[in-house]
């Protein structure tokens, strides 16, 4: 089955089955199952197409362990954790494995040859062969040992792993991983005490898992997988902590599917049972192909196979006497009914594919299916002459009977009857007469005694209470039906139709003949071969169905053909009795020899290798050097049929037998079968567990894990429990967190909705849901609803219901909200009229919600009369009494009222408030907690006992060192000095670029090339619509975008490298320009060559760009290396710790790791902060300390990049930025910030000490203030104002633009804050004067942040981190030119500055203190901090038609001598002046304004920077245009 296509198709047809995992907003699961080969694929196939990047086995093992732990921490299973690696597969699967591995080896060899031809540097040593992921290889044996070590480590050290049952099925246990999982679930389900509402989650990438999950009939079942993207693949792979994961909920899939079949429920001839329909659907889907059988011809998902299968299956259900799938056994007779309907699809394909289609349509239109469809579209019938004549004789009689209503109580002999002519050949016309009579409300009677047929009025079909109007409508309908028959297409006689049918059938047989001849090398003349082929395929359907429902029926059976029979021939294989011989699986080495190509011979034992390459080998023909591929109607290369021979089992075993004695003892062990293993925690066990990888993993000094064999007894088919078990909860009664459509009423229909689930609108039908507004139906007013639910919990985010607190309700005219106040009169429910802004927000939300629900979810919510504002629940926090209360997000969500659910059947236990629990239960004796006191904030603490029922006795550990290392903060300051940011209007002014052009060229600037394709020729450093930036190149604060000196250099490089193109691009308007219009005098070839050079240059420029959210930031690569170097020395010199015992400690002075998630998520972090990991579960040992080197927002959570003091098993090197594996990205809720101590608890003693310190500081401040005289303050203020006016007048005189307008002090607003004025330094032109002019910035108007959220806090942290300081040189050396970019290397290219991360460090900036070698860019965890060098110029390939002046030199801020301090309050005229200069100083040439003076750039100082701003009209227009470009 085409995995991505099937997943995409069902996701677009049933749009809401996918749920993005966001923190804890997913259901709880009892059991988690891992199809481990999906993980192996992700961890080893990351760079399949790039032979220049290689992974060592040690790196692969570490990545696999990290991936497993990440999935465990994501789902957090409560009972069972089952890991299954593919063992030896059944022969039915082995043929597919053989084809795939031969194809993989061929592709790898081609990729290597291509890289060598391109001159790419190939790493030394053998590359990792992905074919080693096959049972029996050395790699798999090592993997098993490493995974066993990993399990022992996690159970010994991780509390969460100890609480569940761990079962591991390695490669030495026969069977595919996914089917081992299904066998395990079958055993669970068949136990008498099995809970039918067990919550299952399977991780895996195979689409077959969807069918396997459905076959269990478990409603609480979900599939976990990574985010799927379609279209062009991104070369940069996300790090694990930034990888999005989705849950595909089978509960919703089941409900959507039931909507598909509800239309036939009342028409079926037997009892409707959705669970049985589901079983039949699974069988039906086998014919589009799977791992064991090829798809039936022309049945391709991307060519409309799915709706065909559904529709033909529905038709078959209406015309058969029961279900096809009888608990895993196929009812072949009923299967034949469905195949008969499916054959109509084949006839349609034949009619489309016939060579002479035009002749076919004209000559055979009367009997072809396509001709019948055309007649149906225009309402035409096809009749022979005699049939039309017969209608003419019936019509007068019928019209006479319809002159008046007939009584429904007429005796039978009085019912109007018309005897048909006796000479009528009823054999030829009986079927036609039946259809005609049914359409006209008649029925046919036959008198055997008279030998005649008659038409009789069907009075039973007439409503006995029919009104006169209804009678007339019936008469008119009959008249129209007769007219349709009389206007039919007429054929002379039946012989003519028979002749056409004969021609049709002959051409159809010829069409099938060509298929069998081309694909299977025999023809339809070989009737026996066609029948054998059909029997093999039907046998295969039964094998697969047994495999799904009962387990492997035969290890040796396989389908011995590469292609399937034609659908119409499949019925020839139904007449058989199907039995299977169980046999036994291949040994691991037999499978290796059966599936591996000769190119992978190093993966098998040396003794067997000659059998592959020796020409005298009896099985040499099993290993061809090349294999043919046949796409067979598919579009993707990987879907092609690999035409490789099938392995003869007998020949293979006989050839290997003589070499078995040459195997080493280790190889003999690898060739044996093993057992599943079960692991458990036993505190009494305490021993040493040796590490299989001493250089990567350390020994487990205190191993508390017990390992045993896990043995299950195979089930007989009679012991298996099929279908949905009794008392399983469905629909609105499902367990908390599991989604259901049925919590709201709706109607459904299939529509071409262009649903946008992925990146493009769907071309297929989607199930569209029309919501019924129950509140409107029940006449519930907004006031009634508000009084009942305001400030209380309701449920939103349907169908994924989540608890939320209703805070307000509005219809756009009136707002209903809850008011809290100490005044009882003002407390409670209130109403107020909506203001203008409220009305705008309401209309905006209304329009966006209608559009979003309709297009993304295929939900039509109807008229939106009210919108609910809610705060979603985030968790529980402990109050001062020890009880737990709900916490809600401070960020509001908005939902249409009709999608709000008032209550649910099963509440989520995770969010139930509870009172205080006994202190000894909350803090068990000897348990570990975190100390929050001033003495050792974040220190490891042990519970020793209880002073009272509310106070603790504890022992706190504190390191001997007095303070935490500050290297992170020190390096942060250095980074701030290296990279300076400038507001967009300053960059625009300095580079003489229009603001709108600057905005587009630094984001997405689309042009149309000669082929009509849209090409982005912008440097993508900012993404307004996506709320993202490129780290180190751009940032956004509340007042607009700012660019770093690195971006300025790129823009200059762009203009210098492609001056003519840059100039012409700067002159276009808002429309997307066409390349030919930009260069009308240039040949298309030369213009396209130029564009190719630009594309290569831009690709090189942006190859290491890291797009992150606006709230993200990181230290540079050099600084991270310096922090690591310092921390390694620091950690090595820590000399022990001291312990202090404390008594009468209140609960709030300690933090319980198991219940602190919601509290810790509210923390703020900054670069350089010291943190401590405080969870007793996860990837890091509890109480591990580290330094924050980066952070980014992930959806609604905050991910912190931490460089830990010690190496950790699950750690990484941040993509090469670290020398050791001590880096990791973690959710903020796992960490406690010990630099910014936000939860510190002060005892009475510490409070007194703190108060004394404050008093001392106040006295010092008062002393300093007393020395200042008011007169001096006034004189300084006067001087600042005078200098500001001098500066403004000076600039005006300098440009000959005299303007007497006074400075408007009020235009910038006033600053009521009492904080000292911010200072910004500007430099006056040296040739005029060196006098410093000082202007106060106290009255700068701050733009408030929109949301008081964690993201907003981090935004502040990012924006404020660049403090005022010395600027850096803007001229950064150019790195060497890549070999594949037009233009070649340039002189002096080796003089490159040290590569920083994620940007270059300018000359003079301090590099690594120990003189480490330059760090090369690598792939790394998000945000990726790769070195980003400025690329070299590339010639455009043809002459420059217009002279282009060189750009003006940039001001070197670092060389500024005297500095000008600008008063922002006095600078509004300066802003107006700059704006006027931008627009009125004449036309521009090549992006440079005529008559303009060379500009200077002043660095920005973060969010609160005080540089002048261009008028809002310019910046807003630029941002709007940029946003529009991004959405194009």
From Swiss-Prot:
Residues 1500-1517 have a biased composition (Polar residues). GO terms for cellular component: cytoplasm; cytoplasmic stress granule; cytosol; eisosome membrane domain/MCC; microtubule; nucleus; P-body; perinuclear region of cytoplasm. GO terms for biological process: cellular response to nitrogen starvation; karyogamy; mRNA destabilization; NAD-cap decapping; negative regulation of macroautophagy; nonfunctional rRNA decay; nuclear-transcribed mRNA catabolic process; nuclear-transcribed mRNA catabolic process, 5'-3' exonucleolytic nonsense-mediated decay. Its EC number is 3.1.13.-. Multifunctional protein that exhibits several independent functions at different levels of the cellular processes. 5'-3' exonuclease component of the nonsense-mediated mRNA decay (NMD) which is a highly conserved mRNA degradation pathway, an RNA surveillance system whose role is to identify and rid cells of mRNA with premature termination codons and thus prevents accumulation of potentially harmful truncated proteins. The NMD pathway has a second role regulating the decay of wild-type mRNAs, and especially mRNAs that are important for telomere functions. Present with 11700 molecules/cell in log phase SD medium. This is 5'-3' exoribonuclease 1.
